[in-house]
Amino acid sequence: MTEYTNLPVKWTNGIVISDERMMLDPLPSEVSAVLDAPINYSYRYNELRRTHSLKLFGVWSGYIPSHADKHLMIFQLLQQEKELTGDEIRLALRQMQGSIKLPINDKLLDSLDRYSLIFAWIAYAGCLDSAFWQQVCADPKCLVYNPDDNLKFSLMFSLARQYSATTRICSADGLRIPSQISPDLGQLAFDLVFNSSVRQTVWFHANDFPAFDFYTKDVGTMVTFHVNFLYNMTHCVPFKTKQSCAEYLIQKAHEAWSVYCGVLNDTIRHRLRLVEGVGIVTLDVDLQILAAVGWYLPLLVYTIRSVSGSDISEWLNVARREFRDLNCSSMINGEGYVGVPEQFWTIHATSKARMWPRVKKYTCDLTDLYNGDLSSTVLGEGASETGTVKWFDVPLGPKVENFRVVGTRIGALSRANVIYNYEDPSDNCDLARAIGSFVPSLPTSGTRDTNGDLEDAKKMFDYRVSQNVYSICQKGKISSLVSRSVKNLRASLMNGELRVYKGSRLWALRAMLFSDKLRYKSDGQVIDPYESHRGKITVRLNNSSLKMLSAFVTLIELAMAQSSGVEDNMLNGRGLSPLQVRSDREVSRVVIAGAINEPLVGCLRRMYPKLSVIGFGMDAVGENERLTVEGASQRNLACDMLISDIDQTFYSDFTKMCNVTVKHALAFSSWSDYVLMKVNYPSSHLLNEIKQALLSRGFSRIVLPVVMCGQNSFTSEVFVYIGRAGVGGHVDFKNNWFTKNDILMRRYRHMKAPLITIPQVVHSVVSKCVTKHDTELFANPGSIVALTVEYASAREVVSLISEVCSPVWTWRTGAGANKFVNIVGMPSKARAALTRRTDEHYYLKAFERNIVGTSFGMYKGIPRIDALNCVSWVTIFGAAMRECLYWIVDTLKVQYNEVISIGARNMTDIEFIKPSVKLTCYDEYYANPQDLATHYNVNYENKYFNWLSPTLVNDSVYVANFVIMAPTEGSESPSATEQLDRIDSVAGAMAKSSITRMTFVGNLYDSRFLADIALSSLPPEGLKVNDTRTTVQIGKYPPCAAVKPSAFLERMKKYKGVLSYHVYPLGYDRVLKTCADNLWIPDVAGSPMLAFCQGLSYAFYITKPAIPDEGIDQFMLDDMPDDGSGSVTPTQSPSPSPSPSAAANTEASTVVEPIDNLNVVSPTVPGQPSQTPVNPNQSTELQSVAKPGIVR
């Protein structure tokens, strides 16, 4: 680093982190226009306290009122004790805009320098009482600056010294201004510039700050410095009390946490600052420690995880406890040093500019930090695409002859012309149907198996969620997914478009969304709200609101074992009214545990005015009670129903977490006969401990974990029903115990320690005309192709982009005057795999017609492009199974020249097939198969596959994804025996001597988990099961018989020695991989079914030549460490389970779970090493041997 030796204090070349707030400062000529634009604001009125809150945003956020502004209409209105209307506020703000002018003069209007809004608003507020600020207003040249100048505002600081307006802090002179530069106008606080009670910030000119004495011995000094500096100027905040300084440091730590979340998630959004930590000069060790928390990320993560709220003593206790393990004590010295992680250092380039002099760079693996509690901000609902054209066509037109991309004017699409939504797409779902829908996971073992149960649960608790898993899991936040549905439902209810009847789920939603008192007609129909109340009764929802309402409905249905029914708002039986969990009396009291400011409390009071509803929690506010479960011994919480949303994620010790969760379950069960409690770590051990503790205390209870609509799409949490009765009387499982292979336990394990590689979603924009051979485009999912091209070349460029992307959006922003077409494409592996089968390029068939000015769309606004897609769980299920089948083919390392895909209607298999491999598809419905044959060498057979007399091809792979159970034309769905006959027929043909090398992979429905789904209240959209007849019906297809895995294995026994065969379960990690690969989010109604994809179907394989007999059964069951080439190498004996560090690594091991209770032996595969050495970097303490076991 360069050292500046000519300064009073040695300065080193520190990190320069740009503060983009400078870019918000306008040119002097723009000041009038930006101040006159409509003001963005937020307004709230507290009916209980009769107080207003009004905050301004944008250029007006820095406005500080003075006594001269008291006469303005806005401040007169804010003194009234009633809620203001939007029209009143907007009119008053317009009047304020006309009255307030910032200091500017005509001499500056031609300047290209920037105008400092921060100092301008201070000058405006201070000019009445300060000679210095009066002079600044008289000469507004003081307020402009050159962004490239290292000595900004020299004139203003010179005036400050002349008028004795500077203040001395630690031997350096600076300019003191209020820290509160964006006040709440509802507080009616004036003259903040000179109010000594307001926290002040001292700004230093670049020539003055080197005199600052970092080594002050004054025990009363408490000065903090921000790590990134607006205008490249250092500023500090002096404090008078230790309490206020500590609160400030914790606030900055919370802000640093938010920044860390954004960087860790690779979230692309406009950020004003990228580091929020502060340096501190003080001799107080406690404050030094709190400052270190904000910028030393390991300490920050562990503190945030362990402390609820901003309790100073708790922050200090946690921080001190972690010092010895985190090796950061040397960085705490109270001399103003700031720690910056190496990742931030490399992301934001260093510079020779004189900046923060005391920066320490340290190494910290961000992805290695546990991030289970991180939350990302969602962008809200998507915008209309009206006016754009969305292309899905495969290029099947004429050849593109002699087109050269190099000669075409192609540029990057300006961000001013498009909005990219990298967060959650909005799902316009039927909330009335979805709310309260749940699917249970039944216990399956007649006895409790404690062999390795505790150890496995501890390891899962300690595993750190990998960055790859975390990134995709953060994409399914329920509040964003339902934003469009909530908005539309609110409008429909307010406009009287829906009839709402008491007792329906729509009634429950109505009570959640609006705060007015419910009024009814004689038939139970809810009367529309008063006209004067509309717009004032909207309830603000949080991310848990719909989940808690869903939990309430779920608890009723579990307890009463009766569907409340809401198809078209019609009731099934009594619905939700009256509220009963026993037939002899109505519910009189409901308790909500873990409430903070829980909207469900008010919702239930509106639904049931006579009901007593108590919300309590350790962070409760408002009408809820600040109370803990442990501290409730003197509070009567006996109730009819109890719902707990208490988190366990802040516990860092497994034993403590487990003990507290069990104690809570016991307490809740003593207060209520019907409980639904959240469990964040649903291991079989913990659920069995709850069950065991209840039995030991003499409680006869059903213990049943469920997942519900309303939870985040990819959460691993469950809600555990603990009830005296219910579940439709189906209590044959009541005495069963949970195993780690039950559905929701498997989901939990696969999320904490995925057994296959899940890709990292990396959002990026590619601004070039990509071709089908640009393989780097698919290195990680998340890329977007965005460019602007001349209209004359748009046909060719859109056609070429369509070879790689699907869909592709196009639009023009004007007719005639605009000669360019904007193009945005989503890269598609399937599309690129298809078009790579030839070196030729083809037009879209649509371009065979004449192209006119509107052919590419006309759009005058800014379109919003969703980088993610909300899709049905059925789509995810089918794609995950397809990926699983081709993974099996790769794992078997078979050689083949042709793939025969049976039932490949949409060429969904194409992305897994190399361009050099011949592809034949059997599907009776595909249109124009000849075009695919001539353009891309894909042979389509428009007919059913002949299952009973198959003609097989040597050196081939046959793939049957969800077709073995499908009927052929004119026939009914095959029974389980008939499905096995189909497989047997293919296997018999394979066994003939004419076939020397061939592999057959497919899937069947599994009968073992149908009871779980059959007990769901409203089966997810597109699914019907009959656990008595063991049938599954998806979509509009007829019911299909399920087949036990053991039946398949029994039927194949006769081919042992000639063919190799086995079954393989679909894991939840493969479901996550499918969602990440395709940028998919499950729709709200079907998201609970994602976990049950694991048990609804299983894969099988049959291959020839046979794998040696001694290894056949175990081949697909043992751990298979990834050899780094994308293939999987079988091992001779079970491999260690991945350690936490290995689980977090993107090169995660591939581990296969057993699917049945089989007598298996170790494999020996020709040409493969017999054993893979253990990674020496893995922790031996956390390794365990994977053992075959029973799934169901």
Curated annotation (Swiss-Prot):
The kind of enzyme this is, by top-level EC class, is transferase
Record has Metal-binding as a keyword: no
Keywords associated with the record: ATP-binding, Capsid protein, GTP-binding, Inner capsid protein, Methyltransferase, mRNA capping, mRNA processing, Multifunctional enzyme, Nucleotide-binding, Nucleotidyltransferase, S-adenosyl-L-methionine, Transferase, Virion
Residue stretches of biased makeup (Low complexity): 1140-1150
Q: Got a GO cellular component term for this one?
A: viral inner capsid
Region entry Disordered, spans: 1112-1192
Catalytic activity from the UniProt record = a 5'-end diphospho-ribonucleoside in mRNA + GTP + H(+) = a 5'-end (5'-triphosphoguanosine)-ribonucleoside in mRNA + diphosphate; a 5'-end (5'-triphosphoguanosine)-ribonucleoside in mRNA + S-adenosyl-L-methionine = a 5'-end (N(7)-methyl 5'-triphosphoguanosine)-ribonucleoside in mRNA + S-adenosyl-L-homocysteine
This protein's source sits in the domain of life called: Viruses
Q: Where does the record place it?
A: Virion
Is 4Fe-4S among this UniProt entry's keywords? no
| Molecular-function GO term, any one | mRNA 5'-cap (guanine-N7-)-methyltransferase activity
* InterPro entries in the cross-refs: Reov_VP3_GTase (IPR048608), Reov_VP3_MTase1 (IPR048607), Reov_VP3_MTase2 (IPR048606)
**Compositionally biased spans, kind Polar residues:** 1159-1183
Q: What is its EC number?
A: 2.7.7.50, 2.1.1.56
- State its role: Outer capsid protein involved in mRNA capping. Catalyzes the last 3 enzymatic activities for formation of the 5' cap structure on the viral plus-strand transcripts, namely the RNA guanylyltransferase, RNA-7N- and RNA-2'O-methyltransferase activities.
The molecule here is called Outer capsid protein VP2
Q: Which organism is it from?
A: Rice ragged stunt virus (isolate Thailand) (RRSV)
Gene name of the record: S2
